[in-house]
Amino acid sequence: MSAPKKVVLAYSGGLDTSIILKWLQTEYDCEVVTFTADLGQGEELEPARAKAEMMGASAIYIEDLREEFVRDFVFPMFRANAVYEGLYLLGTSIARPLISKRLVEIAEAEGADAVAHGATGKGNDQVRFELAAYALNPDIKVIAPWREWDLSSRTKLIDFAEKHQIPIAKDKRGEAPFSVDANLLHTSSEGKVLEDPAEDAPDYVYQRTVNPEDAPNTPEYIEVGFERGDAVSINGEAMSPATVLTKLNELGGAHGIGRLDLVEGRFVGMKSRGIYETPGGTILLEAHRGIEQITLDRGAAHLKDELMPRYAELIYNGFWFSPEREMLQAAIDASQAHVTGTVRLKLYKGSVRTVGRWSDHSLYSEAHVTFEDDAGAYDQKDAAGFIQLNALRLKLLAARNKRLGK
């Protein structure tokens, strides 16, 4: 790749991307445009602007993408009940396509030669950023400094920062912070003591949730309303997508809901350990499953459950903009036509549980399932023929085994 003259950098204002900004300037002698996405990470983003200005960025973009993030990425994913490896709600994975989309759009608007990101050469994010970028612009050039420079450790990064007078953030304990990714859906923490999967994560790692043991001793009941698979209200109050998730985060965080200690299989081949906090997402998943229980046909629900792991894997691996993800999304969205109604949930000391659900689109018929007199709604004699037909192949198999002496 010829040396770029202008690069758009996905910039958080943190240590890694600040070092990358300086490295791009010194390594390529190029203009650097910074792009900072507000995805609800809960930080004041103006310091990122000030830092980028101080370091000589030629243009600075800071954009509030919270509504777009939840409406166009998080909610479609939750219609699928997507979970990776049975536990992970994909909080980091689902944020990357939107960041890449805006990186490419800004690069085109600025006439930039390339885009750059701060993902390491060991992780999944490098794949996610770059697959999304190439899917949107096949001619885009991507610079991944972690795959080029010799700053191969946190210690070397800090030495570089000190040499170039780049401020180094400290945590409350006066130490360099964990590697943290945060957005409106979740917070993840990696590195340091967490790299030993045998060690219990210290409580100071958690930023978004109280310890469940310290959560209120009285449960809280809430109601979440859905329309066509998307949450639209809490306790009867209509809300925008980002507002729904923000409120669920507040409720879940106060009750210690959504903590996860996970060793996951990365797309690049290795296993990694992360601490995830997804309070609102954990409530949303439980609520969505609750409303589907009464509105989704059994066959459609079971097919959705079969498709979900593949869908989740596509998002985890960075294939949001792939045709196969879009095909699955179309099927999932079609299944949500009648997923409308209300779910009541109980929040208590780290747990969320559906305790009630109702809908004008419900398939639940009390007349058919009652243990009392069903007034002729269901003739139990019909079950005999149903069983005989389904038993036929099993009886034929058993007869063959008997004939062959097995």
From Swiss-Prot:
Which pathway is this protein assigned to?
A: Amino-acid biosynthesis; L-arginine biosynthesis; L-arginine from L-ornithine and carbamoyl phosphate: step 2/3
UniProt EC number: 6.3.4.5
Binding residues for L-aspartate: T120, N124, D125
Major subcellular location class = cytoplasm
List where in the cell it is found. Cytoplasm
GO MF annotation terms: argininosuccinate synthase activity; ATP binding
Specify the enzyme's EC class, one word: ligase
Q: Name one Pfam family in it.
A: Arginosuc_synth
Q: What is one GO cellular-component annotation here? A: cytoplasm
Task: Reply yes or no: does the keyword Cytoplasm apply.
Answer: yes
Please cite one Gene Ontology biological process associated with this protein. Answer: argininosuccinate metabolic process
Keyword Membrane among record annotations: no
* Entry keywords, A to Z: Amino-acid biosynthesis, Arginine biosynthesis, ATP-binding, Cytoplasm, Ligase, Nucleotide-binding
S-S pairs: none
Query: Where does this protein hold L-citrulline?
Result: Y88, S93, N124, R128, S179, S188, E264, Y276
Write out the coiled-coil annotation as residue ranges.
none
The residues that the entry says bind ATP are A10, Y11, S12, G13, G14, L15, D16, T17, S18, A37, G118
InterPro entries of this UniProt entry?
Answer: Arginosuc_syn_C, Arginosuc_syn_N, Arginosuc_synth, Arginosuc_synth_CS, Arginosuc_synth_type_1_subfam, AS_cat/multimer_dom_body, Rossmann-like_a/b/a_fold
| Reaction catalyzed | L-citrulline + L-aspartate + ATP = 2-(N(omega)-L-arginino)succinate + AMP + diphosphate + H(+)
Record note on quaternary structure: Homotetramer.
Which family does the record claim for this protein?
Answer: Belongs to the argininosuccinate synthase family. Type 1 subfamily.
Q: What is this protein called?
A: Argininosuccinate synthase
The organism named in the record is Dinoroseobacter shibae (strain DSM 16493 / NCIMB 14021 / DFL 12)
Organism phylogeny: Bacteria, Pseudomonadati, Pseudomonadota, Alphaproteobacteria, Rhodobacterales
Q: Which gene encodes it?
A: argG
